[in-house]
Amino acid sequence: MAGSKKSNRREEILQALAQMLESAEGASRITTAKLAKQVGVSEAALYRHFPSKARMFEGLIEFIEEALMTRINRILDDEKDTLERIRMVMHLILAFSERNPGLTRILSGHALMFENERLRERINQLFERIETQLRQILRERKIREGKSFPVEERILAAQILGQVEGSLNRFVRSDFKYQPTANFDEYWALLSAQIK
């Protein structure tokens, strides 16, 4: 029972941190004092569940990684058409961001500017994994469909991920007014016409 209660408190702390990142407070540095107040516990109680604020952010990053990579793998299992796979992966990341504005501050790096360098490296690694996955999807087109692209796969993967990252940054910069999935079909039509 004690383990379950501790697990629930950890989740409560992470949810509170995500909510703070989504609020106006998320535009500035979040202190453990503010977070403790939001959760309704002392700072010491926070540290009973997490050894540092960096570990709290890592908990959110782990959630982001698990959510995105699990769903990307599901897309790859279910869909075989190269362009549809790319479209679905792009839409997945944008929709995840739209549903989780606080976590988008982490994905964009905004919430990590004054935090431990290790956290920024984790986000960079996540985007590297996604870009590698996109590159692999693009490379497999030749095997699956007997077609190649007019441009190298690494350049296309970087362009696709750059489009996604730009949408995430715009979402954060606008204080979550510009939804990442707004006009997605039009953006996709433009992008896919360039890479067919």
Swiss-Prot record:
PROSITE patterns on file: HTH_TETR_2 (PS50977)
Keywords: Cell cycle, Cell division, Coiled coil, Cytoplasm, DNA-binding
Lineage: Bacteria, Pseudomonadati, Pseudomonadota, Gammaproteobacteria, Vibrionales
Matches recorded under PANTHER family: HTH-TYPE TRANSCRIPTIONAL REGULATOR RUTR (PTHR30055), NUCLEOID OCCLUSION FACTOR SLMA (PTHR30055:SF183)
Protein family according to the UniProt entry: Belongs to the nucleoid occlusion factor SlmA family.
GO annotation terms (biological process): cell division; negative regulation of division septum assembly
Designated name of the protein: Nucleoid occlusion factor SlmA
Gene3D superfamilies from the UniProt entry: Tetracycline Repressor, domain 2
Protein function: Required for nucleoid occlusion (NO) phenomenon, which prevents Z-ring formation and cell division over the nucleoid. Acts as a DNA-associated cell division inhibitor that binds simultaneously chromosomal DNA and FtsZ, and disrupts the assembly of FtsZ polymers. SlmA-DNA-binding sequences (SBS) are dispersed on non-Ter regions of the chromosome, preventing FtsZ polymerization at these regions.
Matches recorded under InterPro entries: Homeodomain-like_sf, HTH-type_TetR-like_transc_reg, HTH_TetR, NO_SlmA, SlmA-like_C, Tet_transcr_reg_TetR-rel_C_sf
Ranges for domain HTH tetR-type: 7-68
Entry GO CC: bacterial nucleoid; cytoplasm
Domain of life: Bacteria
DNA-binding region: 31-50
Coiled coil: 110-142
Predominant cellular place of this UniProt entry's protein: cytoplasm
Localization annotation: Cytoplasm, Nucleoid
GO molecular function: DNA-binding transcription factor activity; transcription cis-regulatory region binding
Subunit structure: Homodimer. Interacts with FtsZ.
